[in-house]
């Protein structure tokens, strides 16, 4: 009888990526297969996020539900990972006696050893250390799951914004070597991946080592990824304005694989609040980046993060944020009411904006951005859009679902043989969260660059030096 693994994931795309790696790791090394049913699992893993309010209590509520499963099945192993585990490991150990393993984002690669330790009789195994980038060296080869894939290029953040826990839970910025990233993406492309999303807490701070002891910048990495045959779209998440340099903007001018959509968090439009947040830039500098981006790539659409009701935020500060939203014409946003994160400098500031005021401001902001997004969507009516077909439509499995470059979901009728490929569709209807399209043509009628398999590229560029050391240059 096969061993079963259940993973519950909260939070960002990095957590989603980490959870997929946990599943691959435990499948390859210990034979665990994933299940959606927690009641049939032999190992339960909770991958946590500490960004939202009351994150710790949310963890304990979930563990309480899992404790009832363990009471019925004493051999069940429960593990807690992610940012809450990194930040609150001792509290979890003290309060949740059902937990066997506590691990941080940088130690998930040690899960097989931790499970072995528990099975040998150790009571609670804890490892929330930051062992540089070691975890990537010990993860199995990537497995594609559809035509899109996340690829982590770096970990941590060194910006220390006053409201943010990431430097304390994931550590400071550490970049993966350039060759490791290129090889992983080439392997994914060979399995049918057409779009990659490069992940990091601050991807534009990427500075990865090369095989000849040089440093690869983020702009250089983007061009290298674009050169991998079969990869026709590149996205990345997320960025910080202070390191969105001109060389990155230049890539938008000459690299069509990089999509015309950018998520660039600003958090506030008030210079006073930006200073309090320790963001390191002013609103005018953010607008300068957007202006240069739109000069390099006409029609690029921008999304952002906003924190509403940061300590000391006045009506004037909020008005500055709304002015920035109007000036930039954001297409989408992730906007949140401020709540203090324990251990951050902002947690020591008086939380002096009332809950009612925060909610009102959030509603105003979200309504404005929804209006702007609908305006962009209506402009797409009658246009032909290139869609990467991701799978069947959620609401109607007989139809197909894909995404435009600007990250809009499109539903349309076409044969399921198009899943995993590009199609052109005409946009005929607009809804709040999706578009409706009519199939125009399939990939066979397009001039897409797929003359070589990634394996051929690797073989062509792989050379052994006189010491027998293999080097790969894309």
Curated annotation (Swiss-Prot):
Its main location: cytoplasm. It holds the Pfam family Radical_SAM. Its EC number is 2.8.4.3. [4Fe-4S] cluster 2 binds at residues 157, 161, 164. [4Fe-4S] cluster 1 binds at residues 12, 49, 83. It is found in: Cytoplasm. GO terms for cellular component: cytosol. This is tRNA-2-methylthio-N(6)-dimethylallyladenosine synthase. It comes from Shewanella denitrificans (strain OS217 / ATCC BAA-1090 / DSM 15013).
